[in-house]
A protein has these predicted regions:
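Long, low-complexity, Lys/Arg-enriched
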Residues: 168-322, 326, 330-376
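Conserved catalytic-core segment of NTP-binding enzymes
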Residues: 89-167
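Switch II (G3) loop of P-loop NTPases
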Residues: 59, 76-92
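Conserved NTP-binding/hydrolysis module of P-loop NTPases
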Residues: 46-63
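Structural motif
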Residues: 7-10, 37-39, 87-89, 108-111, ...
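Glycine-rich phosphate-binding P-loop
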Residues: 4-23
Length: 376
């Protein structure tokens, strides 16, 4: 399967391009995943979907590459879907080895010096160059050549804007063709190999319920849970918000819940041990009038599923529980199943500025309603 590295110096608009590409590919129903690798990010479009002030507080920074680089190298190499990989603007020689797991490259550079540097970097790791693009903040969008590689200019790549123009559209079409050529029958194969008899494709589920697959709304949750059998082994496949996965995981309890992880394939939501939290998964407790809030933090940014049995979480007795943090879907799913005893559960969803109730046993707090996060 292709893994396309996006390369260029800092402040060249690479993150804007990455987000624009994944949105355009999603609009064309092209299966893929965007992975940011500096340090890695669990949700590729996280920083563009949330409010800027929220982003400032949630951006992952401090992990050393020694902690996450081997895991990321392993997972890119074992990918289960085509990838877009944003490798950052200043990779170290050690971090540059991620390119060995990639197959193609896209250059976005503002000047000849950075272009030469990144072109040599891609050549060292044997990447086939798909596009050689110039970033010009105040210039004009243009397609200079449609051969191999594509050549052109992308203008105005500022946060809050989307890439556009003939060079961008040509790149989207080229990526779509590359990814689709690698994908025939892959979706069906993934669903057929699900470990649960009932495997649900998130995109198909959205359309069945009249939802936009690229813009799920929390108010759809009651219909989702009405549609799916309760207390039954379930497997969920595809791109969806954390609250959707958390709600279905809680709905399946006590039966098994599985989800498809682009890095690992099908994984089961693990059981987490009770106990005093460790450095691997930090937990801060806030107590409010209506709920307790657990603020989770991953100091190393990239968490291996194999470590789940060593991630103790604190017992909580409260009528309502809000789970906050930036976590992989498998961990959200595990947490809501572990805290089933609470009268209602909500998971943070910064894109809506609050937390979405994913399980409730009381009428006053129905599933799908958004509640405010507790503030320190």
């Amino acid at each position: 399967l292709p893994a396309v590295a996006l390369g260029g110096p800092p402040h060249s608009g690479k993150s804007v391009l990455a987000y624009s590409l994944t949105q355009a590919l999603r609009a064309r129903d092209v299966p893929h995943y965007l992975l940011r690798a500096y340090p890695p990010d669990y949700e590729g479009d996280w920083f563009f979907a949330a409010e800027p002030e929220t982003v400032r507080h949630l951006r992952l920074k401090g992990a050393s590459s020694a902690a996450w680089l081997p895991l990321l190298q392993r997972d890119i190499a074992a990918r289960h879907l085509p990838l877009l990989v944003d490798v950052g603007g200043l990779p170290t020689l050690e971090q540059e080895t991620l390119l060995d797991a990639c197959t193609h490259g896209v250059l976005l550079t503002p000047d000849a010096a950075s272009r030469e540097l990144w072109r040599e970097r891609f050549e060292r790791h044997g990447l086939a160059l798909l596009a050689d693009l110039r970033s010009d903040l105040h210039g004009a969008n243009a397609l200079a050549g449609s051969g191999a590689p594509l050549e052109g200019t992308l203008a105005g790549l500022e946060r809050g804007r989307m890439a556009e123009g003939p060079a961008f559209e040509a790149l989207v079409e080229r990526l779509a063709a590359l990814f689709n050529a690698a994908m025939p029958g892959l979706l069906r194969q993934h669903l057929l190999t699900a470990p649960a008899e009932l495997a649900v494709d998130v995109t198909s589920l959205a359309r069945q319920l009249g939802q936009d697959p690229r813009g799920w709304l929390p108010e759809a949750l009651p219909a989702v849970l009405e549609y799916l059998p309760e207390h039954t082994p379930l497997a969920l496949y595809g791109r969806g918000p954390n609250w959707l996965y958390a709600a279905v995981a809680a709905h399946a309890w006590p039966a098994a819940f599985y989800l498809f992880d682009v890095r690992c394939g099908w994984v089961q939501a693990p059981a987490l041990p009770w106990g005093t939290p460790t450095e691997a998964l930090r937990v801060a407790v806030q107590r409010g009038e209506i709920a307790v809030q657990l603020d989770f933090r991953l100091p190393e940014s990239y968490l291996d599923l194999a470590t789940a049995a060593t991630l103790p979480i604190p017992p909580v007795t409260a009528p309502g529980l809000i789970l906050n943090g930036k976590l992989p879907h498998w961990l959200w799913s595990a947490l809501v199943r572990q805290y089933q005893h609470c009268a209602w559960l909500a998971v943070a969803y910064p894109q809506m500025g609050g937390a979405v109730i994913v399980r409730s046993a009381i009428e006053e707090r129905p599933v799908g309603v958004c509640v405010a996060l507790l503030q320190k």
